[in-house]
Regions:
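Acidic, low-complexity intrinsically disordered segments
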Residues: 1-53
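A short acidic, often aromatic-flanked loop/helix-cap motif at beta-alpha or helix-coil junctions
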Residues: 1-3, 89, 171-173
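Generic hydrophobic, helix-prone segments enriched in Leu/Val/Ile
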Residues: 4, 8, 72, 189-196
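Short acidic, gly/pro-rich beta-turn/loop elements at beta-sheet edges
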Residues: 12-14, 27-29, 62, 92, ...
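Core AdoMet radical
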Residues: 31-123, 133-142, 162-167
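Short amphipathic alpha-helical segments
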Residues: 43-44, 192-215
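Conserved C-terminal portion of the radical SAM core fold
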Residues: 50-51, 103-108, 115-201
Length: 215
């Protein structure tokens, strides 16, 4: 862009915007703290667009969350997708009440490790009045042994949410090939992701799917 700094996000998706960068969580498998830092950089001059891509909205101060919401309300732009979602450790009843009036899309959050179970379950309970289709849970797989990852997927389903499974890819990867470790195989990673993300779990158990799947 002549005379200014290119906005890579808008070039990637003209319907997307971001009101802050960085994340204090410092998850080992996430590129955000390495690229953007563990402290938030606020971007108050952001332009409201239908897709909001902030990394960790619920960990922002209440004042800045309200600032983002007010800016959307004044712009008359509908917020259709809070893409990266909310962090279970910082998501509260107040967070839900704050964003409920403006969030027209799904409530997205993650269940990446078994140690997060309590925080994720609490988030699910806060969202208990929302339909399953509006509770989308990112589930990282391949970062723990199969049984632990599979258990997280099953818990998400049992709690009345919809899982979106993401095989772990190394931060320095040059391709999108997932990490294969513990008792995983590349095929098992693909199978679990397909079974979950294509809603096949609604009609067939995972063990039965492995027997009939088409590679």
């Amino acid at each position: 862009e002549v005379g200014g700094q290119a906005n890579a996000l808008v070039h990637h998706n003209p319907n997307a915007t971001i009101a802050s960068r960085g994340c204090p969580m410092n998850c080992s498998f996430c590129i955000v703290p390495k690229m953007e830092g563990r402290h938030f950089t606020l971007l108050p001059d952001f332009t409201p667009r239908p897709i909001l891509c902030d990394n960790n909205l619920s960990a922002l101060s209440a004042d800045y969350q309200n600032f983002i919401i007010d800016k959307y309300k004044k712009s008359d732009v509908q917020l259709l997708d809070i893409n990266s979602g909310f962090e279970p450790h910082s998501f509260t009843e107040e967070t839900y009440k704050r964003w409920k009036g403006i969030n027209k899309g799904a409530w997205r959050f993650a269940f990446d490790e078994m140690k997060e179970e309590r925080a994720v379950k609490r988030t699910v309970e806060i969202l208990r009045e929302e339909p399953a289709s509006k509770k989308r849970v990112y589930v990282l797989i391949g970062n723990e042994p199969f049984e632990q990852c599979y258990e997280r997927v099953i818990k998400v389903i049992e709690w009345g949410c919809e899982p979106h499974v993401q095989p772990m890819i190394p931060l320095n990867a040059m391709t999108k090939r997932p990490v294969v470790q513990f008792d995983w195989t590349l095929q098992k990673l693909k199978d679990l992701a397909r079974w979950a993300n294509r809603w096949i779990w609604r009609s067939i158990k995972f063990d039965d799917y492995k027997k009939v799947r088409v590679v």
